[in-house]
């Protein structure tokens, strides 16, 4: 948004971004969300005001909020395991509800790591503001002016992590001498 006239001008932009992973949401444990998510909101506003013919006021405000959520195991690590472990290496879960694993891949069951290993939630925020007033002093000397400015910056973050463990059972799979999974 932008507009104004001779005495007052403004510009504002708002940007919202949300990226939610293609991975299915954890519905078994609703205490926290382990689905990798990146949410951002950015706002920028500029105001220019001609207070008088020789006095100008400028105000700028920028704010940003960012929230990252996901599995405690890590965003990249979970995808490395999803693509690096064959789908038939072990059962996702055994009939008794215990997660599958193997002597080859250990306890790196991608579903268990995604939904039952814990979560992270990081929230960041920033607020940046500046104000300046400029007074022309042409009545004393042509081209002379005085300007005063002040600014305020505030940046913060909050980090939340939960840990959880899960049971897994070795399915007894191994790799033969010719490289076949047995």
Show which residues each predicted segment covers.
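Flexible loop and strand-edge segments within Gram-negative outer membrane beta-barrel domains
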Residues: 1-15, 19-22, 34-108, 118-124, ...
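Membrane-embedded beta-strand positions of outer-membrane beta-barrel proteins
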Residues: 12, 59, 131, 146-148
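Extracytoplasmic loops and strand-loop junctions of Gram-negative outer membrane beta-barrel proteins
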Residues: 25-31, 109-118, 182
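Flexible, surface-exposed loop regions and adjacent strand-edge segments
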Residues: 27-34, 74-84, 162-173, 180
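Membrane-embedded beta-strand positions in outer-membrane beta-barrel channels/transporters
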Residues: 42-44, 128-134
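Short, Φ-rich (hydrophobic/aromatic) sequence segments
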Residues: 142-144
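Carboxylate/His-rich catalytic cores and anion/metal-binding grooves
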Residues: 148, 155-164
């Amino acid at each position: 948004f932008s507009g104004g006239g001779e005495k007052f001008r403004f510009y504002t932009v708002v940007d919202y971004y949300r990226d939610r992973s293609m991975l299915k949401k954890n519905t078994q444990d609703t205490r926290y969300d382990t689905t990798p998510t990146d949410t951002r909101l950015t706002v920028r506003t500029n105001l220019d005001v001609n207070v008088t013919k020789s006095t100008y006021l400028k105000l700028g405000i920028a704010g940003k909020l960012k929230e990252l959520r996901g599995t405690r195991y890590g965003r990249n690590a979970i995808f490395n395991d999803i693509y690096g472990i064959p789908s038939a290496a072990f059962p996702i879960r055994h009939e008794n509800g215990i997660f599958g694993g193997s002597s080859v891949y250990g306890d790196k069951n991608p579903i268990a790591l995604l939904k039952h290993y814990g979560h992270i939630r990081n929230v960041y925020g920033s607020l940046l503001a500046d104000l300046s007033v400029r007074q022309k002093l042409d009545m004393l000397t042509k081209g002379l002016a005085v300007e005063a400015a002040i600014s305020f910056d505030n940046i913060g973050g909050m980090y939340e992590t939960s840990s959880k463990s899960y049971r897994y059972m070795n399915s007894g799979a191994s790799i033969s001498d010719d490289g076949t999974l047995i």
